[in-house]
Design a protein with these regions (language model features):
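Alpha-helical cap/lid subdomain in secreted, periplasmic
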Residues: 2, 63-240
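Serine-esterase "nucleophile elbow" of acetyl-processing enzymes
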Residues: 1-57, 61-68, 218, 223
Length: 240
């Protein structure tokens, strides 16, 4: 039976299902693929990463997927703690000027790094303005940590093999831009770290990789990151 692998994150995880396939299957052979889906003779990969997505969106998309399907392995790459996402019933899509991410039932508005909109006119901009404190980059951290807890805990409860990380280390943010993504002094005791991996962005910078925008690492760096953490990742094709 094919391995069912699911990835969830923000823009730093877009396209990175190819890196998982390259590291764990040692192949770049032909496969059926779309922007978010890849399938070969041994595995199918679903990449639910969304540019600008925060940790609530990652949690919601995970729960949406688990409602219909139980994968063999999940990798969660959490995003900036400060990001505030929103979801609405899918039937209300006509009320939005932008094109949101959708699931079978919901549409999602990614939090991203929201900039205060002066004289905001659209519903979304007014909602975002009301949801961020522009004098405190840590205003949404506590809610975001609860989202991480919920996502990790449901995978534990369902006994789904998984790993998780945050794209940057919120205790030691490596760049000025990640300092604005939310900083914490320590992790709350209620989050289980047994399947946690180190930050790929911190890995990139510690390895001497140039990260021009202080946020996004490239494919080759993530490939090396997976190889470096391979022994800790609970994805195994030895039985294939």
């Amino acid at each position: 039976m094919k391995k069912n692998v699911v990835l969830l994150g923000c823009s730093n995880l877009l396209g990175m299902h190819h890196a998982f396939r390259q590291v764990f299957q040692h192949t770049q052979s032909d496969a059926y693929e779309t922007e978010t889906y890849l399938e070969d003779d041994y595995a199918k990969y679903t990449n639910l990463a969304v540019a600008g997505g925060g940790n609530a969106l990652i949690k919601w998309r995970l729960f949406d997927f688990l409602e219909h399907e139980i994968p063999d392995y999940v990798y969660l790459q959490f995003s900036g703690l400060v990001r505030r996402d929103f979801y609405f019933d899918k039937e209300s899509i006509e009320n939005f000027e932008l094109e949101p991410t959708t699931s079978k039932k919901h549409l999602y508005i990614p939090g991203g790094n929201h900039v205060h909109e002066k004289n905001a006119k659209s519903f979304i901009h007014r909602l975002q303005n009301a949801s961020y404190n522009f004098y405190d980059d840590n205003t949404n951290n506590w809610h975001s940590l609860q989202d991480i807890f919920s996502a990790v805990t449901v995978l534990d409860k369902l006994k789904i093999k998984h790993n998780w990380s945050i794209y940057y280390d919120p205790i030691n943010p490596p760049t000025e831009n990640t300092k604005m993504e939310g900083i914490i002094a320590k992790w709350p005791a209620f989050i289980d770290h047994s399947n946690k991996l180190s930050s790929p962005l911190n890995y990139a910078i510690d390895s001497g990789v140039d990260v021009p925008d202080g946020v996004h690492f490239d494919y080759d760096t993530f490939l090396k990151y997976l190889e470096n953490n391979k022994s800790k990742i609970h994805l195994n094709f030895d039985d294939k």
